[in-house]
């Protein structure tokens, strides 16, 4: 076989492999390997992801901001509304009070305006029952004289029966009386907020045009004045006198020390102490009463109160405080002890016409030697408990001291009656009549002699006046106006309201 026909065996061409030796002159430097995968993987669309997340954040932030702003605006609106409402309410309250004061100071009343103003003020501030004039007219048989209990300087008192059968005493103030309007306001402001078994209860009121009426609980057994001083009355037993004294003292102690603010009665007297069938005492007639917030700065330019019961400091300074009430209750105690009136009507200008001046030397003697002859009501015929009499005389003596700040508190009087403190604690070692200082600032230039001179001046002015009047509420239980307090004589315990300016014999505090 020739060689031409034999295919030649040749090696296949060697494959070409890229060179593993980099050309440093032309090849770029190798990059660092990626930690998340091969370099050939497509990158995440970072730009698109940032846009979506930002939108969600903006939306969430906007939502939170809207909620916060909305809540803030709502809260702010509520605060503004509350502030505006309270401010408006204060203005309305102030305006109502100003309207009342304006109506009080006017000589003639505008029935339409004053009725509306007083009704709005009373119903919102007092909260007592509001009666119509027709209700009360029907209850008293058209204010018949047969139902007349008594009358005073500013009105009449009738017995009445309400629709539900409740027996009441209805005080009708004289129309157009400025003082009567003041007393109406004082009564509903004072007695509507005090509640005590020894204070008469106010059941409601009526305002119709110029008519002003007050509705009280009916106290059936008349007044202390009636039982002590009315002619042909049986002698009041000592035990009943003691019970009445304790009850009246408790009622006054409540006004002075348990009320907030404390209340000064300013017309404590036997005619204003009502008695029920059990001979429990109820203090009545708050027409002159004031809270301590008023009396701290108030100087009266009218003679307020009742002659024979007025405290010495009032004759000089024109101020009445709780210690003035204490003096007045001391006079009532002397009436219970002696059976005498506070002023001797047969000697209205005598030096010793006052029960206080008459009784002081006798009280000194009685407390020193235990001899009550000449001091105690002879109608008792020595039928009394000697220990109770000693305590009552000691209470009376301490209460009528000329020095107002040395008079005891009413709570001390109550404890002394109950035997819970000694007489020495009550009297503080001072005999009746020893103290002539009365002024609260400690000055000593006002004596009992000067007091008598001032009191004479007051009496003379009241006798010459045609406008003085008595305590109308003292007739709450007296029949047909026969209660002596309804007479025109100030020597029988007459209240007067003549305008004067008391002389300032001491420094006013």
From Swiss-Prot:
Enzyme Commission code(s) on record: 2.7.11.1
UniProt entry tagged with the keyword Transmembrane: yes
Binding site for ATP: 149-157, 171
Molecular functions per Gene Ontology: ATP binding; protein serine kinase activity; protein serine/threonine kinase activity
UniProt region (Disordered), positions on chain: 1-44, 468-509
Polar residues: compositionally biased ranges: 468-499
Extracellular side: 1-61
UniProtKB keywords: ATP-binding, Cell membrane, Kinase, Membrane, Nucleotide-binding, Phosphoprotein, Serine/threonine-protein kinase, Transferase, Transmembrane, Transmembrane helix
Membrane topology term: Single-pass membrane protein
Cytoplasmic side: 83-509
Residues bearing PTM Phosphotyrosine: 216, 314
Catalytic residues (positions): 267
Cellular component, GO annotation: plasma membrane
Listed Low complexity bias regions: 18-34
Any matching Pfam family: PK_Tyr_Ser-Thr
Stored InterPro entries: Kinase-like_dom_sf (IPR011009), PERK1-13-like (IPR047117), Prot_kinase_dom (IPR000719), Protein_kinase_ATP_BS (IPR017441), Ser-Thr/Tyr_kinase_cat_dom (IPR001245)
Catalysed reactions listed for this entry: L-seryl-[protein] + ATP = O-phospho-L-seryl-[protein] + ADP + H(+); L-threonyl-[protein] + ATP = O-phospho-L-threonyl-[protein] + ADP + H(+)
Family: Belongs to the protein kinase superfamily. Ser/Thr protein kinase family.
Protein name: Proline-rich receptor-like protein kinase PERK15
Native source organism of the sequence: Arabidopsis thaliana
Record gene name: PERK15
